[in-house]
Amino acid sequence: FKMKLSYINNEYFQKLISIEIDPKVKNKLISDMCRINILHMICCAGSGHIGSSFSSIDLMNWVLGEINKNHENLYFFSSKGHDAPALYNSLIAYGKLDFSFLNKLRKIDGLPGHPDVNTPNIFTNTGSLGMGISKSKGIIKANRLKGIKSKVIVLTGDGELQEGQIWESLNRVSQENLNELIIIVDNNKFQSDRSVKITSDLNDLESKFKSFGIETISCNGNDVNEFSKAFETLEKSNKPGILIADTIKGFGVSFMHGDKLEEGEFYQFHSGSISQDVFDSSISELSKRISDLTEKHNLDFKIELSNYETPEISLSSNKKQSLLASYSKSIVSLAEQNEKIVALDGDLILDTGLIEFEKKFPNRFIECGIAEQDMVSQAGSFAKEGFIPIVHSFSSFLTSRPNEQIYNNSTEETKVIYSGFLSGLLPGGPG
């Protein structure tokens, strides 16, 4: 199969950046232009995260396009990492990454699926979630020792706030007067599978952050009129700041908007690629909005899309075998035979095949959110109480982050089963 794609060439970004217009209008135009190229990039790769890229691109472009002008040493990076296609396209738009990388997401000698320091103007690797604020603190303190004035802006996700390291890292931010720091929360209300509220509700985020003594503002993170004022207020405060950016997952393409889903419904554009029809509809909607905005402001600026056809991909076999489907049936069958089996999940119910288990045994399905250490320790107690807990996550998360908790469980000489998915060197579909 192959796809017929469209993208916006670099010359249009450079022309728009050079035009003297209201920065807010420029932000809207560049962000929608980036959304077109994000879709192109992800479809070329066959994998990527559209929803979180679309929710955060407006904020990224404001930081790199406007806030960057006021700081000689600005560090800006993403802690959540899923929005790498957005970050790459924002860097490309502002000349910080070569345009030739547009077709090279998840390719050898191209751009990695998550940010990596071997990519120009990427300051930190984004691995498991929760590390970004800690890394920001280290950057600030190191620059202070060197006598260099810096500004550090780190973008986190709302699902990411379920990781314990986030709350450890906030403890001394105010105490140490880290006024160089601004933390952005892309509060798009959805994570890998379902809404944050259902998975692991964060409740009153603003009050939580303020309890750490950190200046905190909430605003619409997809409305440049709101978040530009919020950034200005935080910068003038001369205190460490947190911007809770209330965004919409998939913002920019109406049928991708997460806020239209029913309670408990799965979001379809978190990871992976899209069909030709979905691509065409998305490009049409984005192109029209760009055209309408340029006409509204009487801009001498018209975009012509460039076309690109992906190489033909021949599948070696038409027979598909799904290990996930087999696993799903097997764990349900085992649970039917043994009422002591419980399944614990770390916000990966789709990718670990637990949907049928949850439907059939809702009381024996334990959703833990993005909190592997908590999940593993809960499993240890289930085992101590005579149950057979089966713990589910991606192997890369399950083998390292809760290693001490796994060790502790093993010293209790109980039976806990750890089921790790997507082991291996090559990236899986979810990215």
Question: Which residues are covered by each model-predicted region?
Answer:
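Non-catalytic terminal/interface segments that mediate subunit docking, oligomerization
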Residues: 294-389, 395-396
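Conserved thiamine diphosphate
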Residues: 147-148, 197-230, 412-431
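Short internal beta-strands
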Residues: 76-79, 180-187, 191, 344, ...
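Glycine/aspartate-rich loop-and-adjacent alpha/beta segment that forms the canonical ThDP
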Residues: 4-10, 208, 224-312
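N-terminal capping segment at the start of a domain
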Residues: 31-47, 186-188
